[in-house]
């Protein structure tokens, strides 16, 4: 295996040049931009793209000076993919757990002072369509001081979702739904933090306060 860094396709070499030397080319560049919600209030202070937050806590030099308001008790993460789960875990983990990770030092200090105690993960689709993987969703239940809360009605499949699940006949997909339904059967135990999953909900507006800061979200 050979690694070549600091190479920009289209600047240092072209796709045609790559094709001339390799039989197979795999593009794994990652998502560099976020999908906007296109709702009123999206540009208020306190509303951030996931890529900014992830780059910040991972220590990307272009993002280390970003400021995130962690003084509020509740935060919402819109999306039900692995990135959403990663963001939610960072917000929910204790400082002791974060210390064992490779999180940037400045992000650790900011999160150590965080007052966020409730994190909502909001999905526009249902549990069958959720994009997160089973290891990711299972790991949230292993965090030290977090109650994972899933409303039972939202993981009770309607006929269309059940038909899709049966049609796919995918054991991994069945297991994903089972994990969510297991969380739904658990009663909260009074832990310091709560991670709440909501399905089939769509943000329609972010409402700001007199300072232009996000105050609440309308679904």
Name each model feature, range by range.
Residues 1-44, 187-190, 196, 204-217:
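Feature captures the FAD/FMN-dependent oxidoreductase FAD-binding
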Residues 9-13, 53-56, 155-158, 204-205:
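A short acidic, often aromatic-flanked loop/helix-cap motif at beta-alpha or helix-coil junctions
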Residues 34-113:
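Glycine-rich dinucleotide-binding loop and its adjacent helix/turn
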């Amino acid at each position: 295996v050979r690694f070549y860094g600091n190479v920009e396709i289209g600047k240092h070499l072209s796709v045609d040049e790559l094709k001339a030397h390799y039989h197979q080319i795999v593009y794994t560049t990652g998502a560099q931009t976020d999908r906007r919600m296109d709702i009123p209030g999206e540009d208020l202070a306190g509303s951030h793209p996931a890529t900014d937050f992830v780059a910040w806590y991972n220590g990307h030099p272009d993002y280390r000076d970003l400021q995130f308001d962690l003084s509020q008790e509740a935060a919402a993460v819109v999306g039900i993919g692995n990135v959403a789960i990663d963001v939610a875990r960072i917000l929910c983990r204790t400082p002791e757990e974060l210390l064992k990770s490779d999180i940037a030092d400045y992000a650790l200090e900011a999160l150590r002072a965080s007052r966020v105690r409730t994190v909502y993960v909001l999905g526009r689709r249902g549990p069958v369509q959720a994009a997160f993987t089973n290891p990711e969703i299972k790991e949230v239940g292993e965090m030290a001081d977090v109650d994972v809360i899933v409303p039972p009605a939202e993981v009770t499949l309607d006929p269309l979702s059940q038909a899709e699940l049966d049609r796919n006949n995918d054991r991994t997909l069945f297991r994903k739904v089972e994990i969510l339904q297991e969380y739904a059967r658990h009663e909260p135990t009074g832990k310091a933090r709560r991670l709440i999953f909501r399905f089939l909900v769509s943000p329609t507006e972010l409402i700001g306060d007199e300072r232009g800061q996000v105050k609440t979200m309308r679904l």
